[in-house]
Protein backbone atom coordinates (compact mmCIF):
# COMPACT_ATOMS: atom_id res chain seq x y z
CA UNK A 1 0.00 0.00 0.00
CA UNK A 2 1.44 3.33 -1.00
CA UNK A 3 0.97 6.66 0.70
CA UNK A 4 -1.49 7.70 -2.01
CA UNK A 5 -3.73 4.78 -0.99
CA UNK A 6 -4.26 6.50 2.36
CA UNK A 7 -5.80 9.44 0.48
CA UNK A 8 -8.76 7.12 -0.09
CA UNK A 9 -10.14 7.77 3.36
CA UNK A 10 -12.30 5.62 5.54
CA UNK A 11 -15.35 6.94 7.33
CA UNK A 12 -17.19 6.07 10.49
CA UNK A 13 -20.94 6.63 10.14
CA UNK A 14 -23.00 6.54 13.33
CA UNK A 15 -26.74 6.16 13.54
CA UNK A 16 -29.23 4.71 16.02
CA UNK A 17 -32.23 2.46 15.47
CA UNK A 18 -35.20 1.69 17.65
CA UNK A 19 -34.23 -1.98 18.15
CA UNK A 20 -31.92 -4.80 17.05
CA UNK A 21 -34.36 -6.00 14.38
CA UNK A 22 -34.35 -2.64 12.58
CA UNK A 23 -30.61 -2.22 13.10
CA UNK A 24 -30.00 -5.64 11.55
CA UNK A 25 -32.24 -4.87 8.56
CA UNK A 26 -30.35 -1.66 7.88
CA UNK A 27 -26.96 -3.32 8.33
CA UNK A 28 -27.91 -6.23 6.05
CA UNK A 29 -29.05 -3.82 3.33
CA UNK A 30 -25.76 -1.92 3.43
CA UNK A 31 -23.72 -5.13 3.52
CA UNK A 32 -25.64 -6.82 0.67
CA UNK A 33 -25.16 -3.77 -1.54
CA UNK A 34 -21.42 -3.89 -0.71
CA UNK A 35 -21.47 -0.29 0.51
CA UNK A 36 -19.77 -1.25 3.78
CA UNK A 37 -17.39 -3.96 4.96
CA UNK A 38 -18.72 -4.08 8.54
CA UNK A 39 -20.95 -2.59 11.19
CA UNK A 40 -20.88 -2.85 14.98
CA UNK A 41 -23.97 -2.71 17.21
CA UNK A 42 -24.09 -1.35 20.74
CA UNK A 43 -27.06 -0.96 23.10
CA UNK A 44 -27.37 2.66 24.22
CA UNK A 45 -29.74 4.92 26.11
CA UNK A 46 -30.43 8.27 24.48
CA UNK A 47 -31.80 11.44 26.09
CA UNK A 48 -33.04 14.09 23.68
CA UNK A 49 -35.46 16.88 22.87
CA UNK A 50 -38.23 15.87 20.45
CA UNK A 51 -41.37 17.84 19.59
CA UNK A 52 -41.02 20.14 22.59
CA UNK A 53 -40.42 17.45 25.19
CA UNK A 54 -37.43 15.74 26.76
CA UNK A 55 -37.43 12.04 25.93
CA UNK A 56 -35.30 9.05 26.69
CA UNK A 57 -35.14 5.82 24.79
CA UNK A 58 -33.20 2.59 24.65
CA UNK A 59 -31.75 2.25 21.16
CA UNK A 60 -29.21 0.29 19.17
CA UNK A 61 -26.28 2.34 17.91
CA UNK A 62 -24.72 1.30 14.61
CA UNK A 63 -21.06 2.12 14.03
CA UNK A 64 -20.70 1.71 10.27
CA UNK A 65 -17.32 1.69 8.54
CA UNK A 66 -17.03 2.53 4.84
CA UNK A 67 -14.63 3.81 2.26
CA UNK A 68 -14.78 7.46 1.30
CA UNK A 69 -16.31 6.87 -2.12
CA UNK A 70 -19.34 5.19 -0.50
CA UNK A 71 -20.06 7.58 2.38
CA UNK A 72 -22.75 9.56 0.52
CA UNK A 73 -24.43 6.37 -0.72
CA UNK A 74 -24.43 5.04 2.85
CA UNK A 75 -25.94 8.28 4.17
CA UNK A 76 -28.63 8.19 1.47
CA UNK A 77 -29.53 4.55 2.18
CA UNK A 78 -29.79 5.27 5.90
CA UNK A 79 -32.12 8.21 5.19
CA UNK A 80 -34.19 6.09 2.81
CA UNK A 81 -34.52 2.94 4.95
CA UNK A 82 -34.38 4.26 8.53
CA UNK A 83 -37.35 3.70 10.83
CA UNK A 84 -37.11 7.18 12.40
CA UNK A 85 -38.67 10.34 11.02
CA UNK A 86 -35.38 12.17 11.67
CA UNK A 87 -32.50 9.70 11.86
CA UNK A 88 -29.22 10.57 13.49
CA UNK A 89 -26.54 10.36 10.79
CA UNK A 90 -23.13 11.46 12.02
CA UNK A 91 -20.09 10.77 9.90
CA UNK A 92 -16.43 11.63 9.98
CA UNK A 93 -13.18 10.57 8.42
CA UNK A 94 -11.07 8.34 10.65
CA UNK A 95 -7.56 6.97 10.79
CA UNK A 96 -6.81 3.27 11.02
CA UNK A 97 -3.89 0.91 10.90
CA UNK A 98 -2.58 0.01 7.45
CA UNK A 99 -4.11 -3.47 7.18
CA UNK A 100 -7.54 -2.38 8.40
CA UNK A 101 -7.48 0.63 6.08
CA UNK A 102 -6.64 -1.64 3.18
CA UNK A 103 -9.41 -4.08 4.08
CA UNK A 104 -12.09 -1.35 4.35
CA UNK A 105 -11.10 0.01 0.95
CA UNK A 106 -11.14 -3.46 -0.63
CA UNK A 107 -14.92 -3.84 -0.25
For the regions a language model picked out, list residue spans one by one.
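Positively charged, small/polar-rich N-terminal and surface patches that mediate targeting and assembly
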Residues: 1-107
Amino acid sequence: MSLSDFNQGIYLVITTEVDKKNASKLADLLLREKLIPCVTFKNVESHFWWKGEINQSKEVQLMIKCKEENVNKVRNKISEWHSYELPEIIYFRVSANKNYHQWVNSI
